[in-house]
Amino acid sequence: MTALLIDGNALSKTLRAQAAERAAALTARGHQPGLAVILVGANPASEVYVRNKIKACEDNGFFSLKDAYPDTLSEADLLARIDELNRDPKIHGILVQLPLPKHIDSHKVIEAIAPEKDVDGFHIANAGALMTGKPLFRPCTPYGVMKMFEAHDIPLQGANAVVIGRSNIVGKPMAMMLLDAGATVTICHSKTRDLAAHTRQADIVVAAVGKRNILTADMVKPGATVIDVGMNRDDAGKLCGDVDFAGVKEVASHITPVPGGVGPMTITMLLINTIEAAERAADAAA
């Protein structure tokens, strides 16, 4: 059996077309959705991510603003800029590209973003709202994964799901969303004693640790759905995920590729979150 590929590019195209329609409707009402992206320093990967986010905005009728600063920017100046954007009615979403330079406290920066403009869903108010089943914004990567399950009719209710990784950005919110959908969820991480014992029982495995080949074919239950959130480089410098794709695709029923899987969905859900923020702001102003 060869797994069915869950194509993130194709699903993104459909969802972005829907986002563009909603953006056009809002713009016609005088409320073009606006996203501000802040980049501090010259991290090459961060520069690529920011460029892709700005391009996605431009391609789908969003207003976008990119603030790029040297890594010498002070924390106080960054917080002051966020305060300005919080009060700017043209901006509905604010995203600070992580990681930040060491002298800037990323937790403090995230908490400075107004919760109603926190389209990454990282603010403590939004994390708490997700935890209690009343999310304002869902973090973009796990939200994109949930859309993939939905598009491919992958049953979650009663399913055994293993999430490998416990970050605030992917692992923890992913587990909460699966739990809300009725799955029985196990979170595994670097201190987990026998990872394979957990993954072999799983109907769904989400790998999100940033470690190549953490999941191999012998660790996967036949017919499982495998979602690869990892972004790594192989020995030849080629982009790859956390999953041994060649081996696992012969065992799983569904699998996401890297690249072209979860990556494009993350930016798509950023657009969806920004649209939702803009729609709420427009309704409040009406």
From Swiss-Prot:
Its EC number is 1.5.1.5, 3.5.4.9. The keyword Hydrolase applies. GO terms for molecular function: methenyltetrahydrofolate cyclohydrolase activity; methylenetetrahydrofolate dehydrogenase (NADP+) activity. Keywords: Amino-acid biosynthesis, Histidine biosynthesis, Hydrolase, Methionine biosynthesis, Multifunctional enzyme, NADP, One-carbon metabolism, Oxidoreductase, Purine biosynthesis. GO terms for cellular component: cytosol. InterPro entries: Aminoacid_DH-like_N_sf (IPR046346), NAD(P)-bd_dom_sf (IPR036291), THF_DH/CycHdrlase (IPR000672), THF_DH/CycHdrlase_cat_dom (IPR020630), THF_DH/CycHdrlase_CS (IPR020867), THF_DH/CycHdrlase_NAD-bd_dom (IPR020631). GO terms for biological process: L-histidine biosynthetic process; methionine biosynthetic process; purine nucleotide biosynthetic process; tetrahydrofolate interconversion. Transmembrane segments: none annotated. Pathway: One-carbon metabolism; tetrahydrofolate interconversion. Belongs to the tetrahydrofolate dehydrogenase/cyclohydrolase family. PANTHER family: C-1-TETRAHYDROFOLATE SYNTHASE, CYTOPLASMIC, C-1-TETRAHYDROFOLATE SYNTHASE, CYTOPLASMIC-RELATED. HAMAP family: THF_DHG_CYH. Catalyzes the oxidation of 5,10-methylenetetrahydrofolate to 5,10-methenyltetrahydrofolate and then the hydrolysis of 5,10-methenyltetrahydrofolate to 10-formyltetrahydrofolate. This is Bifunctional protein FolD.
